[in-house]
């Protein structure tokens, strides 16, 4: 099981590091969009939509990377005072909750994504980016990766429980 958790962690780390480069691309596109709009009075719907096409993978894959590295949102004000045992309990409970939430989002988003792919959904804006269905397809994909990372966190926390019990 620990090998599975390690493999999941390595994959999520790889995806997260690759996705991080999209942040640079997003900043450049946004900067160019602002420069063109306010410096030259030239608006570009394509560039505005491209920002969303970059932001979606940053968010859906970034949340997995943040969970892996413990940078996700947590109420550290209280958590920092918990014993190690209670921290592990909270980590197991939240990881299981994360898996349940991921499964729900995947189940609810699949018909939405399927419909988008089946009609080859594009933009309604003239001059915008077609292939909106690709971005929508990242929703269940990102939550599947989040499910796997939550599973990895559950495995690691359960092994930490067992190791702590063996020491005591």
Residue ranges of predicted features:
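Alpha-helical transmembrane segments and membrane-interface helix-loop junctions
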Residues: 1-168
